[in-house]
Amino acid sequence: MSRVCEICGKGTVKANRITRRGKAKKEGGVGKHITKTSRRRQKPNLVKVKAIVDGRPKRIKVCTKCLKSGRVERAY
């Protein structure tokens, strides 16, 4: 099963997790320094929804942004 919205195509994105050390400048230190970056994945907020597709009810994966904006016609 893919983690992709079937309406807008939003999927997983690669991002960095940044590890810092040191004391912040506003707290009287010399500033934060990056010691390590590691890759991580940001996943979309998907919901399985029964929606009307081509006039028939079908269960699809939709991101919550499409659901809130009204791009999906729900079938109850």
Swiss-Prot record:
SS bonds (residue pairs): none
The keyword Ribonucleoprotein appears for this protein: yes
Single GO biological process annotation from the record: translation
Domain of life: Bacteria
The keyword Chloroplast is assigned to this record: no
Pfam family, any one: Ribosomal_L28
Gene Ontology CC: ribonucleoprotein complex; ribosome
Gene3D superfamilies: Ribosomal protein L28/L24 (2.30.170.40)
Residue spans of biased composition, Basic residues class: 33-42
NCBIfam families reported in the protein's UniProt record: L28
HAMAP family: Ribosomal_bL28
Protein known as: Large ribosomal subunit protein bL28
Species in which this protein is naturally found: Halothermothrix orenii (strain H 168 / OCM 544 / DSM 9562)
Name of the gene encoding the protein in the UniProt record: rpmB
